[in-house]
Amino acid sequence: MSNNKQAWTGQLDLSVFNNGKKSVARDVFFEKALKVMRPVYLNQSDIPTFYIVNVGGGYLDGDRYTMNFNIDSDAKVILTSQGATKIYKTLNDHVEQYQTFNIKNNGYAEYVGDPIIAFENAKFYQHNVFNLESTASLFYTDILTPGYSKSDKRFSYTYMHLLNEIYVDDALVTFDNMLLDPQKQNVDGLGYMEDYTHLGSCYFIHPSVNQKFIEQVYEEIKHFQHKYDCRFGITHLPTHGFSLRILSNKTQVIESIITAVQCYVVKQIFDRDVDFLRKY
């Protein structure tokens, strides 16, 4: 699986810069199955929110997607999807998606997408590359859920493969290679899904993040493990950041935990409230 020259099912490129008053888009390009809506500035914020849309309604066998986001120095952007990413059955091929985030010093990208739903016989590969300069910041989330299965299997998709590479000043600081392959692995077992079906992931990188801050984040969310049937852990990355992994049987539980983390870090680091991303 490689990001070589090929006919893309959907392609999107977005660049954001700070014009001295607010962050605005400099270059926006999209074609075929991918589209980005005009930015909105929620609650009179100086940060644009972009909604990314798959006009086809779902990912089909053989689809290939690429998205590139460039955030200039001192620019900030919020990115989200307009709905769940649905991966339908891929009997002959598979689906690939590539996302690249280039964030310059004092730039910030906040990506909170809707769940990725893999239906029966789906094969999905996603490769994310995050290139951050030393004072750049990132908040990124993914939620993986199994779709409807005629046979009522807990994991009816063929595989879901997510690869994340994070670079800070061109040095690789995180290589997260996650493969869920029910045909070859006991994904229900220890070290994988541990009797849960839904998986949430979150990365937060900022120069202010240290072990004490990570412990404070954990204190903010630890009550969720008593309130809901879920399990999670926070890991200090080999840089100024952390990753959060959540296991549950419900998307809403994972979303609640991620939102709590997002609200806490955004308030503590940027002194702002999280805007509700209205989707209809």
UniProtKB/Swiss-Prot annotation:
Location of this chain's protein in the cell = Cytoplasm
- Gene Ontology MF: a single term: nickel cation binding
- Return the GO cellular component terms, semicolon-separated: cytoplasm
Q: Which UniProt keywords apply?
A: Chaperone, Cytoplasm, Nickel insertion
Pfam hit, one: UreD
Q: Which residues cross the membrane?
A: none
Which coarse location class applies to the principal site listed for this UniProt protein? Answer: cytoplasm
- UniProt xrefs under InterPro entries: UreD
Q: Which family does it belong to?
A: Belongs to the UreD family.
Protein role: Required for maturation of urease via the functional incorporation of the urease nickel metallocenter.
Assembly with partners or alone: UreD, UreF and UreG form a complex that acts as a GTP-hydrolysis-dependent molecular chaperone, activating the urease apoprotein by helping to assemble the nickel containing metallocenter of UreC. The UreE protein probably delivers the nickel.
Name of the protein this chain belongs to: Urease accessory protein UreD
What is the native source organism of this protein?
Staphylococcus saprophyticus subsp. saprophyticus (strain ATCC 15305 / DSM 20229 / NCIMB 8711 / NCTC 7292 / S-41)
This chain is encoded by the gene named ureD
